[in-house]
Amino acid sequence: MVVQEDIPMMELFRKSVNASREALTKVEVREELTYHYAIVRVYSKMLVTSCAIYTLLINGYPDDAMALCRQLYESLVIIDTLLKGKQKNDTELLERFMDAPVIMALRDDYETLSYALKHDPNDQYAKSQMKMLDQEIQKYTQKYQKDRIDAFKDYWWSGYDSFGKMAQQSDFPKGYMYSLLSDKVHMNALGAFLYLDNSEPGIPLGDVDGGKQQPLWYASLFLYCSAGIINDHYPEMCPQSVIDLLKQFSIEASMYMKK
């Protein structure tokens, strides 16, 4: 739900994301092994996530929007890592990043089939699928000198064995902000008991009126930072007009947070 005082900020959020999406749709995209294509993929996902955050906020679900803000931060760190690789002309980093989705899909399929065979070792369909899967798996385990498919961790492509280590090497190190965002993702004590909207006593079982300040500020910050570093390399993706609008959004979201 949106109360009267939220309307200007929500409108600025919508306007900023729409301007960002419109600029990106004008960029020529070819599916190829380039940093340009890699950045387009991550940034486009970031804008789609921003649309989801807007939808959750306008319908009164700030805590769920906050959880998605963590995805924006993770996207920002990935973009920063890729752009640093571009500066170094690191073709191996790029290739690992582009191979990662295929490898992660193989890992998921392997775990699913392993589970099926564990419960029914005579499952002929699972056996035949596993045999075909093994051929694809060997191609990547040999290429990257891994013993097993499950040796590929989620952020292996970055050269670090965890997101935290990758973030610490970026210009946007993981700190208290990421911890606050994680509290809205993990079902821990904070996630269960602390709500962004605390205007009403009791446990909310539906949409709420308040709690939009923090998600708006996080979203504005991560979008502005991403657009800024992308503009340094690919100004056509994030033109100055978009950066100016995101800067305004970030400044006003910061002021809105202090109210």
Please place each PLM-identified region on the residue numbering.
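Predominantly late transmembrane helices and immediately cytosolic-facing juxtamembrane segments
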Residues: 83-88
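Secondary-shell segments that build the walls of catalytic and ion/ligand-binding clefts
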Residues: 1-31, 100-259
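Acidic/His-rich structured neighborhood in mature extracellular/periplasmic domains
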Residues: 82, 93-103
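Long, hydrophobic/aromatic-enriched structural stretches that serve as scaffold segments
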Residues: 19-82
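Residue-level recognition of alpha-helical structural elements
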Residues: 35, 58-61, 65, 90, ...
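Short amphipathic alpha-helical surface patches that mediate protein-protein
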Residues: 70-73, 95-98, 247
